[in-house]
């Protein structure tokens, strides 16, 4: 599937099953102390090999599952044809606690798809898809409130389990894209944008940084769309008398319309013009007259990955006596 997605410059979005982690359900996600040790075992040799391939950047696995709808009932989701209560209720009509698997869950890739369509609808690009303020918020999730066994009012987590910041970073490092629910709200957020690819590390820091960028979904989406444009534009020029230099100038004029090099640009401007710098080089293929090879070099606007805080404490020691 990754080979097909790479050939078509069309990222493949899917979801990881809990069995991939050795769980029966994602509610067990908080139990392991170190997930990385699990994925270093011999059982995951093929997964690690897949992550090291070039085409794995076109695969994104979201997780965990998302609540698809509220349980049927007069107070939650009425059925017009007949009176149906999917969950048992107390004497005052409030729902009681029900089994986790009795809820209707759906693939988290659909939630990820809503962030992509929202970003494209607003900006014309699928780059603003992560962070609470950067387009990664999934709002309006089904919020089922019930009476727990101890008599307290509780909310069913619409993403199966609350994921901590530490576990979210751990999952992203392992090649997954977790959806994190904000407690006592009806929304969740995709903080990361990691594809399945494991970024390679080189001796050159610039090469390492470039590998990390190319493994991020927003940048894969942007470069894939530009690749689609280039293929269609080049097809329309077949049969023309265009020289390599003319083709290069023509393509550079076109791609410059998506570049915004202003350092003080707003977040909206960066979402509409996702490239900070770009250029195209066109060269003739040796031994094949009339066949040109176009190389596109792009520098996108970078999104904040992490903020590390340090504390400095100064204490005055009183003098004795």
Residue ranges and their predicted role:
Residues 219-282:
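Extended, compositionally biased non-globular segments
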Residues 279-321:
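C-terminal edge-of-domain segments
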Residues 86-247, 302, 306-309:
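Long, contiguous, structured domain-core segments that constitute the functional module of a protein
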Residues 13-15, 190-193, 283, 297-299:
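Generic beta-strand/beta-sheet core signal
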Residues 1, 203-205, 242-252, 263-268, ...:
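Composition- and surface-driven signal marking solvent-exposed, interaction-prone regions
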Residues 6, 272-274, 288-290:
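Solvent-exposed loop and beta-edge segments used for protein-protein assembly and interaction
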Residues 1-155:
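Extended, regular secondary-structure scaffolds
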Residues 19-23, 197-199, 287-289, 303-305:
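Flexible loop/turn segments at secondary-structure boundaries
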């Amino acid at each position: 599937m990754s080979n097909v997605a790479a050939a078509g410059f069309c990222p493949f979005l899917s979801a990881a099953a809990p069995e991939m982690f050795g769980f029966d359900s994602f509610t067990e996600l908080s139990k392991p102390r170190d997930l990385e040790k699990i994925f270093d075992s011999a059982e995951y040799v093929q997964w690690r090999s897949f992550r090291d391939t070039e085409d794995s950047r076109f695969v994104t696995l979201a997780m965990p599952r998302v609540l698809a709808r509220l349980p049927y009932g007069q107070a939650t989701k009425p059925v017009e044809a007949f009176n149906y209560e999917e969950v048992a209720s107390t004497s005052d009509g409030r729902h009681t606690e029900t089994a986790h698997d009795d809820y209707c869950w759906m693939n988290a890739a659909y939630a990820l798809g809503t962030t992509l369509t929202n970003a494209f609808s607003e900006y014309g690009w699928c780059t603003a898809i992560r962070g609470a303020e950067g387009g990664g918020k999934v709002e309006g999730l089904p919020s089922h409130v019930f009476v727990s066994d101890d008599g307290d009012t509780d909310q069913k987590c619409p993403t199966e389990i609350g994921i901590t910041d530490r576990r979210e970073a751990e999952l992203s490092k392992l090649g997954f894209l977790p959806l994190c629910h904000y407690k006592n709200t009806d929304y969740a957020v995709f903080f990361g944008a990691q594809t399945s690819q494991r970024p390679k590390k080189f001796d050159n820091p610039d090469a390492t940084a470039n590998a990390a960028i190319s493994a991020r979904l927003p940048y894969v989406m942007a470069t894939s769309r530009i690749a689609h444009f280039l293929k269609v534009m080049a097809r329309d020029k077949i049969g023309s008398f265009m020289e390599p230099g003319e083709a290069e100038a023509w393509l550079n004029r076109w791609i410059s319309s998506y570049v915004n090099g202003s350092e003080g640009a707003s977040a909206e401007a960066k979402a509409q013009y996702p490239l900070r710098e770009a250029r195209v080089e066109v060269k003739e293929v040796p031994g094949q007259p009339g066949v040109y090879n176009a190389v596109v070099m792009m520098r996108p606007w970078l999104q904040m990955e992490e903020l590390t805080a340090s504390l400095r404490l100064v204490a005055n020691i009183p003098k004795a006596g």
